[in-house]
Design a protein with these regions (language model features):
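Acidic/polar loop-and-plug regions of large Gram-negative outer-membrane beta-barrel proteins
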Residues: 93, 97, 110-116, 120-183, ...
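Face-selective signature of the C-terminal outer-membrane beta-barrel domain
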Residues: 174-199, 222-339, 424, 472
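Membrane-embedded beta-barrel scaffold of Gram-negative outer-membrane proteins
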Residues: 179-185, 189-195, 199-207, 367, ...
């Protein structure tokens, strides 16, 4: 269920998550706009019928990074066939962070009740609550002058935090789902999901830092006070049906989704600059001491997005080996925006806009052996103008049309060496049109891009080399470039055709080796490589490639309990996990140690 706002996608505590699925290619027929290239589906833990258990985990590591978590699944009632099952998962995590004055605390609770109302009808009530607080969030490390070629930082200052002392990020999230499932027959079943999402997010930070001309001081600017108040309510109905079509095996997935997504934003900003500080010794100051900032939140805009969607997918067995997969999705979007501040020509009191979107996919899958297939597919997708309708301004909606895209993908999945190994290979071409990117002069604004093309190859494999040694790895190569994009540079229009978008590595690779010393002891090493990325649209700035290594050793105390020690970034590599065009260098985590104990009984 997408909440249609990227800022809401904060990392979740994995304790309440059952699994994460990569929905590749054209997932748009189920999950809506933005699915060319795939999407991630975070699936929460739910009550089930497969046995009672209790489990827990305790973790502690560098920089006081810690977690305490527990959960249980329990049948309610007495008898050989219980009708109700309950699950509860709770976790508390936190830490002081490797950056000065940065700390974080998070609570996560997930509760679900599964009730078998009849042998064929069941209902699941699922509730989730997340509460996160982060003090003095890290917004990046300033880059040394001059800005040319490879961007560099003062590595001795990698842990400095230039945010104010009372910088803050908070979020409170509540999820409710009511899931009704009915098995009509062996060939037909349906599911109805009512969902409610309520979130409040608060930001209070000083976010931009630059060195002065001789790199002796850091100039701080861009104070940002913000609150997001968001509610999403909707209902999704899904039907699965298997019935021959023209004498051929046929499986259908049909559905309807209606939602109302409303968000009110309360921004206050002051650009500054707010003076120069000595990076060797400075007082971070307090947010409300900054000129132009004062306590309290003032409404800016309320955006309401109503979405009505119909989707259908069919898998048709043309032969025993060859299948045709098709899918269609129709979306009707209604945007209603109300301005709570001063009315101007560029920011009217109220405006509306509507869109009708039809996207789809078609593909062939050939199963040439029981353990190998090859597929070819074409898909289309659409994104809202300006990127996010729940925060879109009048200018963004006026100046942008729907962002569209299409994708060709050719791939194969197969097992080898008598099942000891498995692999996936894919080659793709993605074209995106009429979308937006962050304005390099003001990351809170966006600028339009006409078209971008990406071509790439992805491969993943696992191999049981010996009964005790398992190797897993993946590799991705991509060639991404702007086809139509003109950027305003000092009042002059400059074409960026042929340039690579920032923060897009050409190559990424991962490798994991796991060895079972004996039934109780297990160890492993891992490596991750990311090639150099550009830091601006002109491709005149870049940050270097990096490789980070890790290792772990675990001991099974008994059938229920495992103790694991882990080291990340073994060589204490200093690297940029992300870079902004201001430019700011987001330094990756240093070397860290962790010890955890997990049990289940």
């Amino acid at each position: 269920i997408p909440v249609q706002y990227s800022s809401a996608m904060r990392p979740l505590d994995d304790w309440i998550v059952d699994r994460v699925e990569l929905v590749g290619g054209p997932s748009s027929f189920l999950n809506g706009a933005g699915a060319v290239g795939g999407s991630l589906d975070y699936i929460s833990k739910l009550a089930d019928r497969y046995g009672d258990f209790m489990e827990g985990r305790v973790r502690y590591g560098s920089y006081d990074d810690s977690e305490v978590a527990f959960g249980f699944n329990q049948a309610l009632g007495i008898g050989p066939e219980p009708k109700h099952f309950v699950r509860l998962d709770v976790s508390r995590s936190g830490g002081n962070g490797y950056v000065d004055r940065n700390s974080r605390e998070s609570w996560n609770v997930a509760f679900s009740l599964l009730s078998d109302l009849t042998p064929d009808l069941s209902h699941t009530l699922a509730l989730e609550y997340q509460d996160e607080q982060e003090d003095s969030p890290y917004w990046g490390t300033p880059v040394l002058n001059p800005y040319a070629g490879e961007l560099k930082i003062d590595k001795s200052r990698r842990r400095e935090n230039y945010n104010v002392a009372d910088g803050r990020y908070e979020q409170r999230v509540r999820w409710l789902r009511s899931i009704l499932e009915y098995r009509v027959s062996d060939s037909t079943r349906w599911r109805n999901t009512f969902y409610h999402y309520d979130a409040e997010r608060d930001y209070r930070n000083l976010e931009t830092y630059r060195y002065n001309a001789d790199n002796s001081g850091v100039v701080r600017s861009n104070a940002f006070l913000q609150r997001h108040d968001q509610q999403l309510n909707g209902n999704r109905f899904e039907l699965q049906h298997s019935q021959p079509l023209f004498g051929l095996a046929s499986d259908w997935a049909l559905g309807f989704d209606y939602s109302i997504n409303k968000q009110t934003r309360f921004p206050s900003t002051a650009s500054g600059p707010f003076g120069t500080v000595d990076p060797a010794s400075f007082e971070p100051g307090h947010f409300y001491d900054l000129p132009g900032m004062r306590p309290g939140h003032r409404k800016d805009r309320s955006n309401e997005v109503r979405t009505s969607a119909l989707f259908a997918e069919n898998r048709l067995g043309l032969t025993d080996e060859l299948s045709l997969v098709t899918g269609l999705r129709y979306d009707h979007l209604d945007l209603d925006v109300r301005n709570h501040r001063t009315v101007t020509a560029s920011d009217p009191a109220h405006f509306e806009r509507r869109w009708d979107v039809l996207t789809g996919r078609a593909g062939l899958v050939y199963q040439f052996t029981p353990h190998a297939n090859v597929y070819l597919q074409y898909s289309t997708a659409a994104d809202p103008p300006g990127g996010v309708l729940t925060s879109a301004s009048f200018g963004q909606v006026r100046d942008y049309d729907l962002s569209t895209g299409d994708q060709w993908e050719l791939g194969s999945k197969f097992d080898f060496l008598d099942g000891r190994g498995s692999a996936t290979l894919a080659a793709y071409r993605i074209v995106r049109r009429d979308f937006s990117v962050a304005d390099p002069n003001n990351p809170n604004l966006s600028v339009p891009v006409g078209q971008q093309t990406s071509r790439g190859i992805e491969a993943a494999a696992s191999l049981r080399i010996t009964p005790k040694l398992l190797a897993e790895g993946n590799f991705a190569w991509v060639d991404a470039q702007y086809d139509e994009f003109t950027e305003n540079v000092g009042g002059v229009a400059v074409s960026r055709k042929g340039k690579t978008p920032p923060n897009v590595p050409e190559r990424v690779g991962n490798l994991w080796l796991t060895y079972d010393f004996d039934p109780a002891w297990q160890g492993g090493v891992d490596a991750r490589y990311v090639s150099s990325v550009y830091a601006n649209n002109a491709n005149t700035w870049h940050v270097p490639s990096y490789t980070v290594y890790g290792t772990f050793l675990s001991y099974r105390l008994d059938e229920r309990t495992r103790i694991t020690g882990r080291v990340r970034n073994l060589t204490d590599e200093v690297y940029a996990r992300f870079v902004q065009s201001t430019p700011l260098y987001y330094v990756g985590d240093p070397r860290t140690f962790e010890l955890s104990v997990q049990t289940r009984f």
